Amino acid sequence: MNGFFEEAKQRKVYRVAAAYLIAAAGVIQMASAAFPAWELPNWGLRLVIVLLLLGFPIALMLAWAYDITAQGLVVTPTTAVPRAHRRRNIIMLVATGVTISATAGFFLLPRVSAHKIDKSIAVLPFENLSEEKTNAFFADGMQDEILTNLSRIADLRVISRTSVMQYKSGIARNLREIGQQLGVAHVVEGSVQRSGSRVRINAQLVDVRTDRHLWGQTYDRDLADVFAIQSEIATTIADQLEAKLSPAEKDAIERAPTSDITAFDLYTLAKNLCLTAFGSSTTKANLLQAADLLNQAVARDPSFLQAYCQLAFAHDGVYFVGFDHTPARLAQAESAVQAASRLQPNAGETHLARAQNLYWGYLDYDGALAELEVATQSLPNHPRVVELKGYIKRRQGRWDESIRDLNRAIELDPHNILTLQQTAQTHQVLRRYVDEKSLLARALAFEPNDAVTKVQHAFVELDSKADTRPLHQMIESIRPAAIPSIANNWLVCALAERDGTAAENALTAFGGSQITFGSAENVLFNRLFVEGVIARITKNEDRARSAFIAARAEQEKIIQAQPNYGPALCVLGLIDAGLGRREEALREGRRAVEVLPVEKDQFGGNVMTG
């Protein structure tokens, strides 16, 4: 053993080993700093380290065999040792070099591998640079398609469009602050200019933690190439973030949604309407207008899958909310789902549309959940998939699972105020008032002027403590800016305080909006019934009875069109109760509960029995 160390010293192996290790450490340190700055991939740094580790045993062997002299590189003279000892010393040299390299690699490579790229991303609204400002919807469509393509990639975490809508282009945007608010490391921003048959699209990827532009490109092409550009942008961004792209994901990204630009324009307009339909005073009008636009889109391109799926959503929404709970409306939704199934039966959008239809159209919870499980495989970042799971499970009474799914939807869509409100209402049903207020406060943190959320937050005190004062004060503070949107809560507050004048003012504020008395469910009351309730609390019995009789006649027409719709039967029962028709009211109430028992729907059923 001593012979090995003596010979290694004589051949200056120690000196070479020390010099190599110092130089390698310097190279690794410089590469660790330079690779990110030069936007080089992480695997490149790992390759440098591996090559340096492999080179160490080779350097030792070269130092053993050669020496540098004034005459140049010469073979080191062989010492007078037995041949067997020389062989042993060479084996020990190689073993030592390999052991040191392996040990260094054990500590270095995991640390480099642990430096993974944060693959979270948000696609901000694109700026419309077209001379025709009406083309703004086209810029929306560009952003939405790029976002949709990225959301197909399971290796990315993509924030939903609803949460980025507030960061409109054309105003100063602090990208670092936006990244912190959305919980992402990267954002995509860009602009679109459409002129005749040409389109210019600029897109750039920014690391918001450092404000570094990782990639940028301007595309100046024919309008017919717009979908190829969208696919190219999504694929390039995935490459920049080193996202793993499966063959199925790649195929889905490269598949153009339609070949008809006009059909795409119609679809984009309709999708924008659907995106903001619920939770507003124009839900019915928006859904019906969207359905009309989508019918035009599929007439132009009968192979437009996404348009059929969105069309099914619009019809299912009109049916489920109770605007038109008729077999004819459900048949239109079913027809759109079947068209999507014929076109692409295995597409994630098809499974999502079918799940929505099974849930909203038939209350087939198990069937809908099965479809959503399949949809998850190709739509891993789609918040609607997990959001629907949450809504379905709360109707099944699987409350904790429901809240977990809804919280997951909020992670993917953190600024979706409707999802936050619905999750808060789930806590309300469970009387978890602290959690309810916390979620509503979270919504107000990014939408401090949202009247509905402000009133909902104040409503918790009425619901939990029968204290109308916070709600009353809040309503007083925001009138008349957003009267139609808060009219339901205003009406409830006025009736709770037995204030007939305030109740009449609230009723006037409804305009054409639906009256739900603040219910989270689809129990729609007609205006005449409310007039009867107000007349009763103001002791005007003649007026109350006249209003209830007229309300009953109106409600009977609804029942004739949809005889097995529980919420409509529930309202008829309440009208008969107002008329003092006790037996009829009980019969209609029982019928409503038979049609929609609590066992079938623990969320909506509780509203009707409560």
Question: Where do the model's predicted regions map?
Answer:
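Acidic, proline/glycine-rich low-complexity intrinsically disordered segments
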Residues: 6, 34-38, 88-493, 497-535, ...
